[in-house]
A protein has these predicted regions:
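Multi-pass alpha-helical transmembrane bundle typical of ion/small-solute transporters
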Residues: 1-208
Length: 208
């Protein structure tokens, strides 16, 4: 399989997932004159939408970045990429769940936040695993052209997410808004410049 085909498939999954988020924003059904208050009451929906949109968008940008280091697509890379896409495609569901129950209080609020936090944790771990495979699998990545210090810097950047997403799992048991806030901070972190310019290196037409 060519790298271009793999990227096109991945881009399609990202595009669908990020589009599905907006479909979860409900149109309030209210009496005349009650719409402004009803729209304000939906703030958890907007907050969850913005954070999840940012996360999916930034995952897509960094996915493109790490794919710039691929020289050859093999079966292991295919399955690791599919694993990442599994969690990306799932994000709209826990986003809707969190938005619905963020102010519910008690067990329902914590359960919704926990599902959201776990989804993001597995997504972060999957992305880190994908990068480690590209960086260390002989013949797959072109990272040998980088200085070791550059590889370590990128590894820290792409692997550090999972432990911090896991922190949001603990917060989910206390406060759904706090859980969402941690994910928002992580989105900002990964949106910041880092890692330098990315180029597609090597012959990307080779495949399994």
């Amino acid at each position: 399989m060519s790298l271009g085909r793999l990227e096109a498939f991945s881009d399609g999954v990202f595009a669908i997932a990020i589009t599905l988020l907006v479909l979860e924003i409900p149109v309030p059904s209210v009496e005349h004159g009650e719409l402004p208050d009803a729209l304000l009451d939906q703030w958890p929906v907007y907050a969850a939408y913005v954070v999840s949109f940012a996360i999916i968008g930034i995952i897509w940008i960094n996915h493109h970045a790490v794919f710039g280091y691929i020289e050859r697509v093999d079966r292991g890379l295919l399955f690791l990429n599919l694993n990442l896409l599994l969690w990306v495609a799932l994000i709209p569901w826990p986003t809707s769940l969190l938005a619905e129950y963020m102010q519910a209080g008690g067990t329902d609020e914590r359960a919704a936040a926990l599902v959201y936090a776990l989804t993001m944790t597995f997504m972060g771990a999957s992305f880190g695993g994908l990068w480690l495979y590209i960086a260390h699998r002989p013949g797959v990545g072109a990272v040998s052209r980088l200085q070791p210090v550059e590889v370590r810097a990128r590894t820290r950047r792409f692997v550090i997410g999972a432990p911090f997403y896991a922190l949001s799992v603990g917060l989910a048991l206390v406060s759904a808004p706090a859980c969402l806030a941690v994910n928002a901070v992580l989105a900002v972190y990964y949106a910041l410049p880092g890692g330098g310019a990315i180029e597609h290196l090597g012959d990307t037409s080779k495949g399994v």
